[in-house]
């Protein structure tokens, strides 16, 4: 499974990229707003840090506007991927962009039907939101299972990005299902490092070594 960072915080991207853990980055207007910086500047800087795909989202709601924005965004760097909402106009834009060789990430996927439509339109990636489904009492991970089953049955090459990841279980379970990518907030990625027995083990090793050195 590949790990993308779901953030526009350049410092955090640098921190985790230095560990060799960042295969790509996903952003959205809300994340960039938090940084208080120019949209294009942030995307350009992220692309200079990370070699993998960097998703940048369009704002337009009509296909023509999305395509025009996409063509400007891909000028920033070769690894920019255009994030498109799951709407009819969005699918029209994805169809156009895919024929021009521009990679797309269809976002706000909440059903297997939506994922299938996006794949048929030519999406490079689809982003099903597991956490938001959990929020309304549905099983977000069940959606990942359904999408992986359908894509596998038909040999669909569109990659699945597990999004709206809220805790490590989302990562573990989606990895078991064979999801291609999880896009993870840095606070959740931090939690993947942790286990109480690891901490206890380190403390014991250090205590034993300290006792040995005092002999």
Curated annotation (Swiss-Prot):
GO cellular component, one term: cytoplasm
Top class in the EC scheme: transferase
Listed InterPro entries: Aldolase_TIM, TAL/FSA, Transaldolase_3B, Transaldolase_3B/F6P_aldolase, Transaldolase_AS, TSA/FSA_arc/bac
Presence of the UniProt keyword Transferase in the record: yes
Primary location group: cytoplasm
Keywords from the named record: Cytoplasm, Pentose shunt, Schiff base, Transferase
Enzyme Commission number(s) from the entry: 2.2.1.2
Pfam family, one: TAL_FSA
UniProt xrefs under NCBIfam families: fsa_talC_mipB
GO molecular-function terms, A-Z: aldehyde-lyase activity; transaldolase activity
Pathway: Carbohydrate degradation; pentose phosphate pathway; D-glyceraldehyde 3-phosphate and beta-D-fructose 6-phosphate from D-ribose 5-phosphate and D-xylulose 5-phosphate (non-oxidative stage): step 2/3
Gene name as annotated: tal
Signal peptide (UniProt feature, chain positions): none
Annotated active site: 83 (schiff-base intermediate with substrate)
Species of provenance: Methanococcus maripaludis (strain C6 / ATCC BAA-1332)
Top-level taxon of the source organism: Archaea
Family, per entry: Belongs to the transaldolase family. Type 3B subfamily.
Compartment(s) of residence: Cytoplasm
Gene Ontology biological process: carbohydrate metabolic process; pentose-phosphate shunt
SUPFAM superfamilies: Aldolase
Role according to the record: Transaldolase is important for the balance of metabolites in the pentose-phosphate pathway.
Keyword Nucleotide-binding: no
Name the UniProt record assigns to this protein: Probable transaldolase
